């Protein structure tokens, strides 16, 4: 089936309307929680993704692309601003960019592009649930509470049911219509961004309006796209052998209980089916470009804000530096770009800002964290062949992890430092020998750890950043608590952690008070309003 689709599009791609390619159109489709390892072999064999495969055949696939923060808003803040999370202070899903922050889309519009943004944006401050922000603020409190619903799978509809995520399909239809409108207008280049919610798990409705997303939902139609026999059951470390931050994540994500092998397999199969539905939305956008004769003069990019663990490491969701969570897809196709290229260079989402500006012929501003990827994928000899850094930085400061986390990826190594670098032990994985990341070799390679930690500190003073996040959490929580007045005890007891909180509400409130009293700023009393 894929070969038929590819031949059809190859013919169309070669016979699109001839247009000036000096300033090509730009289309970015950004999904949510898409495991980047599915965009190339062997992961791509598990589920049929014909349109991602199409981009792989006619464009460039980045085999080592990473999020700069494995959670929605901070990751998108990095992508839209081109700057690392600690520079924009995008600490959690509630604290990200200011509403007036300059994005690469602003730069394109300022330089003559007709721009449109549709679907999930999620890069500015102020969004997400109260539970989500309070869980992030209180991650240093000495209690352990389940914050998410237990991950489950849900089958809906029948073999004719193709549109499960209706909001995404609605936005995809709008984007398709907009492309047709652009084709009928002037030759002014355009830039289109389409943000998808899929394959992010759905809210578990039975847990109430504040519930997080723990339901993997699909239909029989999309299940046929998954080769179930190729779906692996991930190995888990015993809970007692887990790193303390991973233990905290597993518990707060409600994954510490028993799971049958069939449960785990079903969650993973359903997740892959959700990826297939997202791929179909990408396909509709590509089809619209082909039908309008615009495909030959359009750079098409597919990526995601982060991945999905799908029960690897006894976790679902993201908020982790393990590959399932931090590795994102990145495929780029367009005029004067290489075809069928697989790029081993380690890259990250902050690289997209300078890449898109260079594609549009716009000089990049000087304070970006990222570097253009165009030298790696362009056919043109006029493109500067500046060497891309051989490392990436990802960091995490939000909920479901009880320490600020810093991932430094270089060569075969993934080094993960925490907090101040001393209070929480670091981790080191050799991804060449240990693709499942089950063997922390930090004690075997002290020289490697020392070298990588020195490199990491040359990029970010992570102990200082961790202190800043710690102080922000206390100030933000204290302000929120004061805003509630006499309703505080009732409100905090009924957040997503209510089942565990209400087992001993008084003890949990005292733990919060103790945390606030242990201030790093002795002149500030966080317990007073």
Name each model-derived stretch.
Residues 172, 306-312, 350-353, 358-431, ...:
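C-terminal cap/loop subdomain of S1 sulfatases and analogous C-terminal strand-loop tails that border
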Residues 39-75, 82-83, 109-116, 229-233, ...:
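Short, structured active-site-proximal loop/turn typified by the sulfatase FGly-forming signature C/S-X-P-X-R
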Residues 7-20:
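N-terminal signal peptide
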Residues 20-24, 33-46, 146-165, 180-188, ...:
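Active-site-proximal cap/lid insertion segments
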Residues 123, 209-210, 323-325, 394-443, ...:
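C-terminal, low-complexity/hydrophilic appendages and adjacent surface loops
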Residues 41-43, 59-81, 96-97, 117-128, ...:
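Short, solvent-exposed turn/loop segments enriched in Gly/Ser/Thr/Pro and often Arg
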Residues 78-174, 178-184, 205, 211-217:
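Catalytic-site neighborhoods of secreted/periplasmic enzymes
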């Amino acid at each position: 089936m894929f070969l038929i689709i590819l031949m059809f599009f190859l013919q169309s791609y070669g016979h699109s309307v001839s247009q000036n390619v000096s300033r090509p159109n730009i289309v970015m489709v950004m999904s949510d929680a898409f495991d980047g390892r599915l965009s190339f072999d062997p992961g791509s064999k598990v589920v049929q993704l014909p349109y991602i495969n199409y981009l792989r055949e006619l464009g460039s696939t980045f085999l080592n692309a990473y999020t700069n923060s494995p959670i929605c808003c901070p990751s998108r803040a990095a992508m839209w601003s081109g700057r690392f999370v600690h520079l924009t202070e995008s600490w959690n899903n509630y604290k990200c960019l200011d509403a007036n922050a300059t994005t690469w889309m602003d730069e394109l519009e300022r330089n003559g592009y007709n721009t449109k943004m549709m679907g999930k944006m999620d890069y500015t401050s102020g969004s997400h649930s109260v539970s989500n922000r309070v869980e992030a603020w209180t991650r240093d409190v000495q209690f352990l509470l389940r914050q998410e619903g237990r991950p489950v799978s849900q089958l809906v509809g029948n073999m004719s049911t193709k549109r499960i995520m209706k909001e995404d399909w609605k936005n995809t239809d709008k984007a398709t219509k907009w492309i047709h409108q652009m084709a009928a207008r002037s030759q002014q280049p355009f830039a289109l961004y389409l943000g998808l919610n899929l394959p992010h798990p759905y809210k578990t409705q039975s847990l109430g309006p504040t519930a997080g997303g723990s339901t993997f939902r699909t239909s029989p139609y999309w299940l046929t796209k998954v080769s179930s026999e190729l779906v692996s059951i991930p190995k888990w470390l015993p809970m007692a052998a887990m790193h303390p931050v991973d233990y905290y994540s597993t518990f707060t994500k409600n994954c510490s209980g028993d799971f049958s092998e069939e449960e785990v397999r079903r969650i993973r199969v359903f997740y892959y089916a959700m990826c297939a539905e997202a791929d179909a939305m990408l396909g509709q956008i590509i089809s619209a470009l082909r039908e309008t004769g615009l495909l030959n003069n359009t750079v098409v990019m597919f990526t995601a804000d982060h991945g999905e663990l799908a029960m690897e490491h006894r976790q679902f969701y993201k908020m982790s530096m393990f590959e399932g969570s931090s590795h994102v897809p990145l495929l780029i196709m367009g005029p004067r770009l290489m075809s069928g290229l697989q790029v081993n260079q380690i890259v990250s989402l902050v690289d997209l800002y300078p890449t898109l500006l260079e594609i549009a012929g716009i000089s990049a501003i000087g304070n970006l964290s990222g570097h253009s990827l165009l030298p790696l994928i362009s056919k043109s000899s006029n493109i500067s062949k500046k060497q891309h850094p051989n490392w990436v930085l990802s960091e995490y400061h939000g909920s479901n992890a009880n320490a600020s986390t810093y991932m430094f990826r270089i060569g075969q190594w993934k080094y993960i430092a925490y907090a101040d670098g001393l209070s929480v032990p670091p981790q080191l994985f050799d991804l060449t020998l240990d693709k499942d990341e089950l063997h922390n070799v930090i004690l075997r390679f002290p020289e490697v750890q020392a070298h990588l930690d020195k490199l990491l500190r040359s990029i970010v003073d992570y102990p200082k950043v961790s202190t800043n996040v710690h102080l922000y959490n206390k100030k933000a929580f204290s302000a929120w608590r004061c805003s509630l007045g006499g309703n505080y005890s009732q409100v905090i007891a009924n957040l997503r952690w209510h089942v565990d909180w209400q087992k001993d509400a008084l003890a949990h409130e005292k733990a919060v008070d103790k945390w606030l009293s242990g201030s790093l700023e002795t002149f500030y009393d966080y317990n007073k309003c």
